[in-house]
């Protein structure tokens, strides 16, 4: 009775446990995990584009070492494969966090591969849904589903079906604003601290690091009142 809402990913086993242990709780799909579905679909599209470029590159003459001669024919497949291989972070990151170089790479993708860029916009569109929340978020999600269904990118068409399947829990997250973002961030930081604490003989040092860095623990230092 004390648990009224549960934020979790969409795994079936989690739904079963919540239904068994907290039958009256409202289950909310965690926005971080839902957007991660779109990010995974986008990366699958990037790998498809990269593999297509590698296939083209294999049909091109092998390049010799050193600077190519002036009469050497262009190798668009090699160049495209090279640039796409390093495009992951430009596609993954939020637009406001892009470096100048990553922004240029994204602009190159928009110009040279409209399908991959459309996949990027779909990922950003789903992220926007959770930034507006509430009824506006649900209206935006309706538009996103319609767009994804007719985008002609099979993996995003399948993602639209998955979103519809879990629509009730996603709507609940939009209504109640629940997210595991803070917990996920804290877990990531603790993993970093675990690497820092490697080599200590017991977990006490790791616990102390976590308390100091993340727990708000501010002990009084000797000689400093």
Predicted regions and their residues:
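Acidic/histidine-rich catalytic cores and adjacent linkers
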Residues: 1-23, 55-225
């Amino acid at each position: 009775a004390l648990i009224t809402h549960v934020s979790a990913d969409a795994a079936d086993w989690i739904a079963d446990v919540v239904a068994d242990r907290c039958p009256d709780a409202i289950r909310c799909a965690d926005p971080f995990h839902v957007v991660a579905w779109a990010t995974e679909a986008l990366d699958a599209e990037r790998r498809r584009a990269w593999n297509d470029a590698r296939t083209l590159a294999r049909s091109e003459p092998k390049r010799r070492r050193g600077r190519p001669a002036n009469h050497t024919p262009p190798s668009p497949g090699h160049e495209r494969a090279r640039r796409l291989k390093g495009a992951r972070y430009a596609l993954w990151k939020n637009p406001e966090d892009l470096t100048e170089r990553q922004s240029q790479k994204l602009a190159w993708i928009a110009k040279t591969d409209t399908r991959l860029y459309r996949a990027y916009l779909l990922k950003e569109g789903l992220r926007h849904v959770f930034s507006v929340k509430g009824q506006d978020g649900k209206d935006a999600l309706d538009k996103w589903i319609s767009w994804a269904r007719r985008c002609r990118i099979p993996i995003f068409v399948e993602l639209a079906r998955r979103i519809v399947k879990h629509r009730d829990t996603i709507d609940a997250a939009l209504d109640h604003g629940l997210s595991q973002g803070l917990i996920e961030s804290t877990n990531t930081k603790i993993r970093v601290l675990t690497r820092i604490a490697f080599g200590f003989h017991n977990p006490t040092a790791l616990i102390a690091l976590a308390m100091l860095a993340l727990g708000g623990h501010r002990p009084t230092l000797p000689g400093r009142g």
